[in-house]
């Protein structure tokens, strides 16, 4: 173990330590120190020893950087592990890749930036662009930060005039640093050997680990990339100075770049020539792109200039435009063929713009004119165009709008027609609403009048047999009747007839209800049934309240007629049976040779057991029949006929009495009316047919030659009178 503070005074070791100190100063940006004599080279640990089987944590050795190219520690990337890694493309431009997200970017991520870079990244960089002049007097622009050169003037950037060639001093310093890189590498290898020998002579001190061959290869590749980048910077600087162009060959370019220290960074001429040719290809492509962009920008500027120029009209010709804009820089910057194409496009644009503006003005005038018409109450749906024009000239609102005075007449007429149509539509809607209101009012009046009729019907004053003349004194005193007189449509009499007709149509239903009531009560209508008794039967039932009294009377008359008809039929049947028995009884008397001298007391014992005798009801009838037969058969027949005639006369009187009391059934009344209508229609049809036949015959006939004119004229008059 060496004691603390022990130092080696070997001159070789001191020299090696000085070289190492120089390299460290270059790496960390520290000022050089004169000597490290009397300073211990290594501080040995006193109470901790690294186990042989455990590798001591070491920091990777610094990259071999030539003098003058040292990287300040504050500018280097942080030592913390990151997902980002730095790479370079074929041109030597660095780019960054994230192995997790697979994202690639030209911009350095914040993770890889040093604290100084982070602090200055948000600050604006002023004066990046400088303007220089080429040998032929053409201006070009150089960025002092990105080392970019272009012909197109950058927009929105502050540009300063370049007084000296850009990056001259920096190029010299960097070139010197790169030139010394090879020598520094050799010195560094000697230092490593000396350090290894010194540490090997020390017992119990582990030797530093050998550098891996892969790291050495990476350092050499990185150094080669930096050397190539410096050589390309040389070419860019000379290009920006106008010394070389993309049309120069290698021999022409060497004359201008061989005196620069950066030219000697690369030893092989083939490498320099290869880099020069690659730079020519890349720069030629950039020049073409810049030229294309410059031409495109010039075209865009010219197009924008022409579109906004007030003299650009749809009718402007190219020759006239060339005379107007011949002195404009934007016009001169574009060749004639492109100018013509841009001019045609601008003419189309101006025509389209003017058309759109004209359409917008037209729509604005139409809307304004429509607003003026809507605000004028004098213009109605009846107003004509001539009247509207006179009213408009007197309107102050229209007089203030001078632009409307020059409005297209056809558009103005169209707007007026639309306004009139809208006014007519509104008028029709108002009229329809008023008509609906009147109809509702009239309907309410009719409904009130109908309620009046229904109230009369419920009281029994209005029935299906009621007459207008009988109820008019009652109806006319009501105000609802008076309201009906002041409105159009159906009159009070019409509604009365409709109501009565509805009651008559209800007769079938009322008749059915009456029959159901009589069946449920077990009542039967006979010829002697009184109407009061019949009405009590119906009204006393719960269903009887729905039956109309007039229909009840008609139904009563119908049932009475049926009962009387049934009684007549029974009487006729009885009379026929009686005549048949009398006939059989006469035959019986004839068999016993009864004559006018015969006595009933003598004949009776002889025939009392006979069927014809027994069929007679009593002895009075038998004796009467015997007397009739004894007096003669003709007398008997004549007596029965006289009885029948008397009965017929009685029946006729009853029918006439019922017809006087309006007791005829509705069915008989309707049948009579139908018969009358059929009879009248048949007679009318026959008369029409006869008249038609006569007229046809009169047209076909012609007066005979033998007839005199006077006779033919009399016939014609007679036919005309018959036709009339």
UniProtKB/Swiss-Prot annotation:
This is WW domain-containing protein ZK1098.1. It comes from the Eukaryota. Residues 224-282, 295-349, 353-422, 442-502, 507-562, 578-632 form the FF domain. Residues 645-657, 693-703 have a biased composition (Basic residues). Residues 626-724 are annotated as: Disordered. GO terms for cellular component: nucleus; U1 snRNP; U2-type prespliceosome. GO terms for biological process: mRNA cis splicing, via spliceosome; mRNA splicing, via spliceosome. GO terms for molecular function: RNA binding. Residues 78-111, 123-156 form the WW domain. Keywords: Repeat. Residues 681-692 have a biased composition (Basic and acidic residues). Residues 630-639 have a biased composition (Polar residues). It comes from Caenorhabditis elegans. The gene is prp-40.
């Amino acid at each position: 173990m060496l004691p603390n503070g022990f130092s080696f005074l070997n001159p070789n070791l001191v020299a090696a330590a000085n070289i190492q100190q120089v390299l460290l100063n270059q790496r960390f940006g520290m000022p050089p120190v004169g000597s490290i004599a009397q300073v211990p080279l290594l501080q040995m640990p006193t109470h901790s020893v690294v186990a042989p089987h455990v590798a001591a944590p070491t920091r990777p050795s610094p990259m071999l950087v030539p003098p003058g190219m040292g990287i300040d520690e504050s500018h280097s990337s942080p030592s913390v592990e990151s997902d980002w890694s730095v790479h370079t493309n074929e041109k030597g431009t660095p780019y960054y890749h994230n192995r997790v997200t697979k994202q690639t970017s030209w911009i350095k991520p914040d993770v890889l930036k040093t604290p100084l870079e982070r602090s200055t990244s948000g600050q604006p960089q002023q004066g990046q662009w400088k303007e220089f002049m080429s040998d032929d007097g053409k201006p070009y622009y150089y960025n002092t930060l990105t080392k970019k050169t272009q012909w197109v003037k950058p927009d929105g950037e502050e540009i300063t005039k370049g007084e000296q060639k850009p990056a001259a001093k920096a190029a010299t310093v960097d070139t010197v640093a790169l030139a010394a890189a090879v020598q520094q590498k050799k010195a560094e290898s000697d230092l490593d050997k000396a350090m290894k020998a010194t540490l090997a002579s020390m017992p119990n001190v582990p030797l530093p680990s050998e550098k891996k061959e892969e790291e050495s290869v990476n350092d050499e590749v990185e150094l080669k990339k930096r050397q190539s980048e410096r050589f390309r910077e040389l070419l860019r600087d000379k290009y920006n100075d106008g010394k070389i162009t993309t049309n120069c060959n290698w021999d022409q370019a060497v004359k201008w770049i061989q005196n620069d220290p950066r030219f000697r960074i690369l030893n092989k001429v083939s490498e320099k020539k290869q880099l020069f040719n690659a730079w020519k290809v890349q720069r030629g492509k950039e020049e073409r792109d810049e030229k294309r962009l410059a031409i495109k920008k010039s075209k865009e500027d010219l197009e924008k200039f022409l579109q906004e120029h007030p003299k650009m009209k749809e009718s402007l010709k190219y020759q006239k435009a060339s005379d107007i804009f011949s002195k404009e820089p934007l016009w001169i910057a574009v060749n004639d063929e492109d100018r013509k194409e841009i001019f045609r496009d601008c003419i189309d644009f101006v025509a389209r713009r003017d058309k759109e503006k004209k359409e917008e003005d037209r729509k604005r005038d139409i809307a304004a004119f429509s607003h003026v018409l809507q605000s004028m109450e004098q213009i109605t749906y009846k107003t004509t165009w001539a009247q509207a024009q006179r009213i408009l000239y007197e309107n102050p609102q229209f007089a203030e709008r001078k632009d409307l005075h020059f409005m297209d007449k056809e558009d103005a007429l169209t707007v007026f027609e639309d306004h009139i149509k809208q006014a007519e539509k509104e008028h029709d809607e108002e009229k329809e609403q008023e008509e609906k209101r009147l109809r509702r009012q009239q309907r309410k009046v009719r409904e009130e009048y109908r309620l009046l009729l229904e109230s009369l019907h419920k009281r029994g004053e209005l029935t299906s047999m009621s007459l207008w003349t009988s109820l008019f004194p009652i109806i006319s005193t009501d105000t609802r009747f008076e309201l009906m007189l002041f409105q159009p449509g159906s009159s009070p009499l019409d509604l009365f007839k409709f109501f009565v007709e509805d009651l008559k149509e209800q007769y079938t239903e009322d008749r059915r209800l009456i029959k159901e009531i009589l069946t449920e009560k077990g009542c039967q209508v006979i010829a002697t049934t009184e109407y009061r008794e019949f009405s009590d039967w119906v009204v006393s039932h719960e269903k009887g309240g729905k039956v109309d009294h007039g229909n009840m009377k008609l139904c009563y008359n119908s049932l009475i007629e049926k009962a009387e008809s049934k009684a007549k039929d029974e009487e006729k049947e009885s009379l026929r049976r009686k005549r048949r028995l009398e006939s059989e009884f006469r035959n019986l008397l004839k068999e016993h040779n009864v004559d006018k001298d015969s006595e009933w007391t003598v004949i009776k014992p002889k025939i009392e057991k006979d069927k014809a005798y027994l069929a007679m009801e009593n002895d009075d009838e038998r004796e009467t029949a015997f007397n009739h037969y004894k007096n003669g058969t003709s007398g008997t027949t004549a007596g029965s006929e006289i009885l029948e005639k008397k009965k017929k006369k009685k029946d006729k009187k009853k029918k006439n009495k019922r017809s006087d009391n309006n007791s005829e059934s509705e069915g008989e009344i309707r049948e009579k009316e139908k018969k009358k209508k059929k009879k009248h229609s048949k007679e009318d049809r026959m008369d029409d047919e006869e008249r038609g036949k006569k007229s046809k015959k009169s047209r076909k006939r012609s007066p005979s030659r033998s007839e005199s004119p006077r006779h033919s004229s009399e016939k014609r008059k007679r036919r005309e009178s018959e036709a009339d």
